């Protein structure tokens, strides 16, 4: 309900720590009763003190990692607004969402707003490289949602190596080479065509490497 809240637990503050005397002794007497009563509810829980980072995410159907070059600023540009809506949609389906910005920057209130909505945001100084995070945690995710082909270039190989089971979804935002080609034609500048072909080849390579590609219009869909 309040993802940004902090919970403090003071061990032994109420009844001490001696389980053989006083009110505390009922803890051991009632332990087997408690286990029997809640056995069905706890059946899917992991072992105590193992994988706490995963066990804390109960009541979800899976985990999705979003990767973009930076944290979306929904009041600054259309792409960021779309990114927020896409994250909300995935959350509404029952998935836990983690957001990994390529620059690992904390963007103040924008990062805070994401966290308040229940998104786990990965930033420095807790992580110092995108690759090290993927090496240690990519296997935790059922799917990875990457925005922009140049972000995919920096991440897909690491995801395939450390999370072969994860489906990779590429949202290229728009096809950069098409936009550049239209600009070159409008400016009557054929000298830019070689660079545009290079961008096209890179984009198509990343689209082929992904399991699913999202596009926003029919022209890009036809490509």
Name each model-derived stretch.
Residues 153-155, 204-223:
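A short, active-site helix/loop in glycosyltransferases that binds the activated sugar's phosphate group
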Residues 135-153, 169:
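Short N-terminal targeting/anchoring amphipathic segment
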Residues 54-112, 116:
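N-terminal subdomain of nucleotide-sugar transferases
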Residues 176, 192-212:
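Membrane-proximal helix-turn-helix segments that form the acceptor-binding/catalytic region
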């Amino acid at each position: 309900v309040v993802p940004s809240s902090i919970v403090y637990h003071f061990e032994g503050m109420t009844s001490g720590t001696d389980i053989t005397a006083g009110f505390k002794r009922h803890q051991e007497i009632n332990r087997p009763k408690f286990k029997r009563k809640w056995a069905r509810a706890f059946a899917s829980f992991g072992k105590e003190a193992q994988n706490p980072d995963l066990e804390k995410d109960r009541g979800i159907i899976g985990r999705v990692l979003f990767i973009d070059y930076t944290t979306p600023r929904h009041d600054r540009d259309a792409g960021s607004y779309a990114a927020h809506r896409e994250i909300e949609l995935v959350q509404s389906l029952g998935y836990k969402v983690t957001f990994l910005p390529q620059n690992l920057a904390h963007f103040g209130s924008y990062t805070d707003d994401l966290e308040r909505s229940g998104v786990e945001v990965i930033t420095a100084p807790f992580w110092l490289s995108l690759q090290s995070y993927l090496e240690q945690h990519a296997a935790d995710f059922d799917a990875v949602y990457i925005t922009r082909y140049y972000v995919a270039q920096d991440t897909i190989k690491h995801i395939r190596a450390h999370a072969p089971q994860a489906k990779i979804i590429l949202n290229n935002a728009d096809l950069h080479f098409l936009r550049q080609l239209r600009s070159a034609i409008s400016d009557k500048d054929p000298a830019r065509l070689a660079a545009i072909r290079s961008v096209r080849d890179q984009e198509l390579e990343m689209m082929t490497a992904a399991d699913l590609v999202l596009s926003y219009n029919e022209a890009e869909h036809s490509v």
